[in-house]
């Protein structure tokens, strides 16, 4: 199972995704924005397999977070969540081997499948 860092400024999304992925046996750490997520990534001993982040967040958006996170931890898999197609198109231009995106709204089964795909 994976250790996942989840960044989303929407508390309801954070809770739903955390519960869904935890029920599959994953360890999920939640943060409320990109700055907090970046701090968690840089913490001593922090080891994450996957970063799942909303694209549209205040202070540090998800694409900028992904770029900074990958500079720190190049092996990190990244899943970007967004309800805006243009944001996901911008994200697709990132040259990252393990980058997936999911459009909001999504079902819990869909987010679980994305995580399975990343881990495959």
For every predicted segment, state its role.
Residues 81-82:
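Hydrophobic/aromatic residues positioned on beta-strands within the core alpha/beta folds
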Residues 64, 85-103, 109, 113:
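Alpha4 helix (beta4-alpha4-beta5 surface) of REC/receiver domains from two-component response regulators
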Residues 7-8, 31, 51:
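Conserved sequence signature across two-component system core domains
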Residues 42-47, 68-76, 92-96:
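Conserved phosphotransfer cores of two-component systems
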